[in-house]
Amino acid sequence: MKIVCYKDKILKAINSVVKAVASKTTMPILEGILIQTNDNEIKLTTYDLEIGIEYIMDCEVEEQGSTVVNAIMFSEIIRKLPDTEIKIYLDTNNLLVIECEGSLYKLATMDPTEFPELPKINVENSIQIEQNVLKNMIRRTIFAVSNEENRPIFTGCLFCLLYTSPSPRDA
């Protein structure tokens, strides 16, 4: 695997997926980011067995491949690099090498085949909604959500889809 991308693009992707990294787990693979290449894009995936996030971004892919790297260490290194082009590749010892303007970092990797697959989503019963509409809906109802973990049923929001017809004859 060998990719070249700009810091701001990959940092945005990392910041998006790092929210689903397991903090306390007996499975070290869940503390990592799965990095996969496909043509001229990379896919970053995190999954803590409850929440999973995938982020696909365009970048220059020189060699195909995949790996898993510790999310916290990877994000901290990328965050501290200058705002320029970054080379990320696997060396012969299966270490993830990060190069940027004379800086060189090497991180241990994990076997990507051990990373759990995200569950398949049934797109048959899905809807599309604009981001600002969803945010507004959540903002107007979140005050009623409980912070107490002893009654987990009250710590979430129910999404209920109702179908309405504009025609009075359908009623």
Model-assigned labels for residue ranges:
Residues V4, D8-P28, L104-F159:
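Intrinsic, low-complexity N-terminal interaction/targeting segments
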Residues I10, I35, I42-L44, F74, ...:
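Short, structured motif recognition centered on aromatic/hydrophobic residues
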Residues A20, Y55-R79, E149:
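A cross-kingdom feature marking solvent-exposed beta-strand/loop segments within repeated
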Residues G32, I86-G102, I153-F159:
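Short, glycine/charge-rich beta-strand/loop segments that flank catalytic centers
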Residues N38-G52:
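N-terminal glycine-rich anion-binding loops that anchor highly charged ligand groups
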Residues T45, I77-R79, I86, M137-F143, ...:
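A structural feature that tracks compact, well-ordered secondary-structure segments
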Residues L49-I53, C59-V61, L104-K106:
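Short, surface-exposed beta-strand-loop junctions and turns on beta-sheet-rich folds
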Residues Y163-A171:
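Single conserved hydrophobic/aromatic residue that forms the stacking wall/gate
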